[in-house]
């Protein structure tokens, strides 16, 4: 099993290209199931989750080509991929595929809307709390779907061959359920109004994609989304937005180690709250013609309290990284997690590097230390794993991060990007 070796203490300097957002690419890829024309997606990152979803879509009969050919492309970073779901051969998403990645459950919406039926295994992915799919199922039922859960599968069928538009109020904000219902309602009969919908930039990117395919969606990016269903959707060419989580992660790495880095292609409006918080820690963040410049000189790291919440607030997917940054702040900070109930699994691993962190319910109290010391650590999930990398970059001596397959799910060529900016970091194959 691969691991990453880091020798800390080096400032970062140079530029890092920001890849396409995984959390935007996955629903756009799934949207290809809604049409028998070709959907071309630009700026798709080369990640384990993307490759897994390609396999899942292939199981349904979706063909793909990367920049005009099927072979994987290793040069460059994000890619252009063509998806063709002209011939859906199977509406079942089996456990052995879905269990490896939670977002693959989302195929239930497009399959149900276009084919009138779907049988999808209950999902897997990062083991962060329970993350139930109740909202997905309630929403699809509101659109007229008949649902049954049997032996770990959700079996869904439409009445009279087509979903029917309706008003649905999400009991709590859910990005995944908003994605699924927006896709499903695009082919439903009549108007659907989604209230208390997620407002994340990835929702807006999906709405832009669906509208380019011929859907009639308004209000994406606000709590109320209106979808006027159409008979069919066509192909389109759409660009995946830059990854705001990757942007925030590298910005925090610079804030922690010091240095001066331009994050090429980053869009500040996608994570303004997080950038404001990073600025409060003492980093200088400015917009450039090509992205965002992050700079921190010799001044220490100031402690800042944060609470995770849905967009536009501080994102839960940056909580672990920010905790890594706060481990070396000059004073105490409080980090409160409101999205997931079990997202502090990185605390004990940061403690192995010398961090002082105590937990009180859903709040972590971080008492900053003058220095961290390298040690072997174990990644527990995607975002926790990169928080250990950030901490390792600033720690004295050598840090080894094990279970880096978590990193490969969400960060494109991370060690290469950091190494190009002066970090001493390498992947060691088992």
From Swiss-Prot:
It catalyses: phosphoenolpyruvate + UDP-N-acetyl-alpha-D-glucosamine = UDP-N-acetyl-3-O-(1-carboxyvinyl)-alpha-D-glucosamine + phosphate. Pathway: Cell wall biogenesis; peptidoglycan biosynthesis. One of its GO terms (cellular component) is cytoplasm. Its main location: cytoplasm. The keyword Cell wall biogenesis/degradation applies. Its EC number is 2.5.1.7. GO terms for biological process: cell division; cell wall organization; peptidoglycan biosynthetic process; regulation of cell shape; UDP-N-acetylgalactosamine biosynthetic process. UDP-N-acetyl-alpha-D-glucosamine binds at residues 102, 131-135, 172-175, 317, 339. InterPro entries: Enolpyruvate_Tfrase_dom, Enolpyruvate_Tfrase_sf, MurA_subfamily, RNA3'P_cycl/enolpyr_Trfase_a/b, UDP_GlcNAc_COvinyl_MurA. The active site is at 126 (proton donor). It is found in: Cytoplasm. Pfam families: EPSP_synthase. Phosphoenolpyruvate binds at residues 22-23. It comes from the Bacteria. Keywords: Cell cycle, Cell division, Cell shape, Cell wall biogenesis/degradation, Cytoplasm, Peptidoglycan synthesis, Pyruvate, Transferase. PANTHER family: UDP-N-ACETYLGLUCOSAMINE 1-CARBOXYVINYLTRANSFERASE (PTHR43783:SF1). NCBIfam families: murA, PRK09369.1. Belongs to the EPSP synthase family. MurA subfamily. Cell wall formation. Adds enolpyruvyl to UDP-N-acetylglucosamine. This is UDP-N-acetylglucosamine 1-carboxyvinyltransferase 1. The lineage of its organism: Bacteria, Pseudomonadati, Pseudomonadota, Alphaproteobacteria, Hyphomicrobiales.
């Amino acid at each position: 099993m691969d691991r990453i070796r880091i020798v800390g203490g080096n400032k970062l300097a140079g530029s890092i290209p920001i890849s396409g957002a995984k959390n935007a690419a996955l629903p756009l890829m799934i949207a290809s199931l809604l049409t028998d024309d070709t959907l071309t997606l630009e700026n798709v990152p080369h990640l384990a989750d993307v490759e897994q979803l390609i396999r899942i879509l292939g199981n349904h009969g979706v063909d793909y080509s990367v920049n005009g050919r099927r072979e994987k492309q290793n040069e460059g970073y994000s890619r252009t991929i063509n998806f063709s779901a002209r011939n859906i051969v199977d509406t079942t998403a089996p456990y052995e595929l879905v269990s490896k990645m939670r977002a693959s459950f989302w195929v239930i919406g497009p399959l149900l809307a276009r084919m009138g039926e779907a049988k999808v295994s209950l999902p897997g992915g990062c083991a962060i709390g329970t993350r139930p799919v109740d909202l997905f199922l309630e929403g699809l039922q509101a659109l007229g779907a008949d649902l049954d859960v049997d032996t770990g599968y959700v079996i869904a069928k439409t009445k009279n061959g087509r979903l029917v538009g309706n008003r649905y109020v999400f009991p709590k904000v859910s990005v995944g359920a908003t994605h699924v219902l927006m896709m499903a309602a695009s082919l439903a009969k009549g108007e659907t109004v989604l209230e208390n919908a997620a407002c994340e930039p990835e929702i807006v990117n999906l709405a832009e994609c669906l509208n380019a395919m011929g859907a009639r969606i308004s209000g994406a990016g606000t709590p109320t989304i209106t979808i006027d269903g159409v008979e069919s959707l066509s192909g389109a060419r759409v660009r995946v937005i830059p990854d705001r989580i990757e942007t925030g992660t590298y910005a925090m790495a610079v804030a922690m180690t010091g240095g001066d880095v331009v994050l090429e292609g980053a869009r500040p409006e996608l994570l303004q709250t997080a950038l404001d918080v990073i600025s409060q820690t003492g980093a200088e963040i400015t917009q450039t013609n090509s992205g965002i410049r992050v700079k921190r000189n010799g001044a220490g790291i100031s402690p800042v309290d944060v609470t995770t919440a849905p967009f536009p607030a501080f994102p839960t997917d940056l909580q672990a990284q920010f905790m890594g940054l706060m481990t070396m702040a000059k004073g105490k900070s409080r980090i409160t997690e409101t999205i997931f109930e079990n997202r502090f699994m990185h605390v004990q691993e940061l403690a192995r590097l010398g961090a002082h962190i105590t937990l009180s319910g859903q709040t972590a109290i971080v008492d900053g230390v003058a220095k961290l010391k390298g040690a072997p650590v174990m990644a527990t999930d995607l975002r926790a794993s990169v928080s250990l990398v950030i901490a390792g970059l600033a720690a004295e001596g050598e840090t080894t991060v094990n279970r880096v397959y978590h990193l490969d799910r969400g960060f494109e060529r991370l060690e290469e990007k950091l190494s190009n900016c002066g970090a001493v970091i390498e992947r060691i194959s088992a």
